[in-house]
Amino acid sequence: MTEDFSLQELSRLRADFPILGRVGRGGKPIAYLDFSATSQKPVQVIDAISNFYRTSNGAVHRGTHLLGDESTAAFEEGRSILADFIGGRANEIVWTKNATEAINLVALAMRNASLDSAAKPSPVKLAAGDNIVITRAEHHANLVPWQQLCAATGTELRWLDLHEDGRIDCETLGVIDDHTRLVAFTHVSNVTGAVSPVESIVSRARECGALVLLDTCQSSAHMPVDVRELGVDFAVFSSHKMLGPTGIGALWGRGELLSQMPPVLTGGSMIEDVTMESSTFMPAPERFEAGSQPIAQIVGWSAALQYLSGIGMARIAEHERILTSYMLEGISGIDGVRVLGPGADKERIGVVAFAVEGVHPHDVGQVLDSQDIAVRVGHHCAIPLHHFFGVRSSTRASVGPTTTREEIDRFIDALGQVRSYFGGK
């Protein structure tokens, strides 16, 4: 059985994160419970970015000087580091500016292939009568691009529905049929924390000959993720959720699929040859990486992945599982607080959204902030899911590898005061 961190290990871990020493408006150290929105960065990541700019900054794949060669090596090494972390191959990693762009890359490639009458048949080309399937639990980033694709191509958009607690209902898998070309869904909901039944969904998709795209933004920093074991065709990743910098994400795709996808952005760096009349393009992944790339951010993300690997993803998952159960138990003892998501007895991670009776989420967030507890408020880019729960918005607390029981205790204590603060009981 995987062991949780000892108090000494957790203390050493927290010492790597300079921002955890910040004191908030209330005069206490900030209890950061907003890992689902963005993660904090260890000094190893901060130093990697700073050192790159101090010693190695150069353009990638342009020139033969030392700085350019060092930058190119770091840029390409980043592919290998991410590929090793997720169980893929380096030539299957496409750099994007974030996970949203990675999803749009697939959607726009499908659009380009489908609207080009001269395009060769390919697995990403849509035909009359086809459909795309998502779920009601999706972040807007994995909903709106498919709405746009379907509107542009006349394709039907379908979705899997949910149990009352927000988990995907496998009884609705029948919406995936022989005309489904792609099933796109989240590995973990950014509202409920529920882990999706990947095996069941992938199995049904395979029966029907559909491709599968997995959004790992809420899973890849909190549990082991192996794209080949999961059996998907595409997966998207976000650096800033994984202790890395903003401005960099990635698409992983099976090599045989990437090679059949048309480019989305065009320009420098992705061409083989250009004449005044036409152009030819590089093979994947370079075909999808037009223009100058965020090299320093890739260096920082590489350092973050090595940091996570050094801790061990299974250990992080166990630490967060224990804290999630502890948090849910604490919330259950507070009257008037409704958790939007499954209980600790279901497969879930430490993303806990909740509604406080009679109190707006922004007011909840301000009360918590006054006691130096950082949480997220709003609809979390998941309006349809909030409508499913019958609310417009919620407050969300989310844990990470540096979260402590003491921070959870502070959160529960402050949350218990919210309703009385606004005149409730």
Language-model-detected regions and their locations in the chain:
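Pyridoxal 5′-phosphate
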Residues: 1-425
